[in-house]
């Protein structure tokens, strides 16, 4: 465990420097075309819609603060209406900087109505040494909705010679389909994260991890996603249960992780990934 002592003056400085940001919007299908509904933005979080409103809508989240530090609070709340289709990514990888104070808070709420589809495809989250972050992802799908979701986390910037030795990473996921909880997971890494990642039962020395979740998902989808297995550079496990499919990734570097995740996501999506992933 990591303990940090701060004075009242230090706490006041931390509070004054904390960033906040929130994005809340919905999309809806109108005559077979997905259109934006209500939109709320605040603080340093923004959303842009770079493509024309065709059959499906694309959106890009932008953090104008340039990164996330201790005590920052960010929230995203997205609702996809009946028969609407939305693909969302981020403008760049998100960086979580070191903190000697409170953890950053990230809250993500995603709702998809009957016949709707959401592809939640943010780029990587990079944790610097001594970063402290707590993330919550809550997903609520109607019984006839579909989802393609990925998240990846890089511990340190190995290409820059930087490693993550200590910090805190808490990641809480909850997925409900038709009001029923079908997936619940909480990951907690606290203290000497470098040593934890070195354990064979944790990451076996890997510094880049990822998850792709597909709903609905079954054995046939798993077989299709495994077709690229011979070319994987990371350790990849793919399975299905409870009507969903999931792929787990663990790699020694971010480049291998991204390459393998892109291969799986392309097969799952049946189409090209957002152009920002290709840059």
From Swiss-Prot:
Family per similarity comment: Belongs to the UreD family.
Transmembrane intervals: none
Keyword hit for Iron-sulfur: no
Main location: cytoplasm
Record GO terms (molecular function): nickel cation binding
Role played: Required for maturation of urease via the functional incorporation of the urease nickel metallocenter.
Subcellular location: Cytoplasm
Source organism of the structure: Rhodopseudomonas palustris (strain HaA2)
Coiled-coil parts of chain: none
Keyword Transmembrane: no
Gene transcribed to yield this protein: ureD
Complex formation: UreD, UreF and UreG form a complex that acts as a GTP-hydrolysis-dependent molecular chaperone, activating the urease apoprotein by helping to assemble the nickel containing metallocenter of UreC. The UreE protein probably delivers the nickel.
Lineage per the UniProt record: Bacteria, Pseudomonadati, Pseudomonadota, Alphaproteobacteria, Hyphomicrobiales
Pfam families: UreD
Keywords of the record: Chaperone, Cytoplasm, Nickel insertion
GO CC terms: cytoplasm
Protein name (Swiss-Prot/TrEMBL): Urease accessory protein UreD
């Amino acid at each position: 465990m990591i303990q940090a002592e701060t004075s009242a003056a230090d706490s006041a400085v931390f509070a004054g420097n904390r960033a906040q940001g929130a994005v809340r919007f919905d999309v809806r299908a109108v005559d077979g075309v997905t259109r934006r509904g209500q939109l709320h933005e605040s603080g340093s979080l923004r959303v842009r819609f770079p493509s024309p409103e065709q059959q499906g809508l694309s959106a890009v989240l932008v953090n104008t603060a340039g990164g996330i530090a201790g005590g920052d609070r960010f929230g995203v709340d997205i609702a996809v209406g009946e028969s609407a289709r939305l693909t969302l990514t981020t403008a760049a990888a998100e960086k979580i900087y070191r903190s000697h104070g409170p953890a950053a808070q990230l809250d993500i709420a995603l709702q998809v109505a009957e016949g709707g589809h959401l592809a939640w495809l943010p780029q990587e989250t990079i944790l610097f040494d001594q970063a402290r972050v707590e993330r919550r992802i809550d997903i609520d799908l109607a019984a006839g909705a579909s989802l393609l979701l990925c998240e990846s986390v890089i511990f340190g910037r190995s290409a820059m010679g930087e490693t993550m030795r200590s910090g805190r990473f808490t990641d809480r996921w909850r997925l409900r389909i038709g009001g029923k909880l079908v997936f619940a997971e909480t990951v907690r890494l606290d203290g000497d994260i470098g040593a934890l990642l070195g354990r064979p039962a944790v990451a076996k020395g890997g510094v880049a991890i990822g998850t792709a979740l597909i709903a609905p998902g079954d054995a046939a989808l798993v077989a299709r996603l495994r077709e690229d297995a011979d070319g994987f550079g990371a350790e990849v496990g793919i399975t299905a249960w409870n009507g969903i499919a999931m792929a787990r990734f663990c790699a020694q570097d971010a480049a291998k992780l991204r390459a393998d995740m892109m291969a799986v996501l392309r097969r799952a999506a049946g189409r090209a990934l957002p152009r920002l992933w290709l840059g």
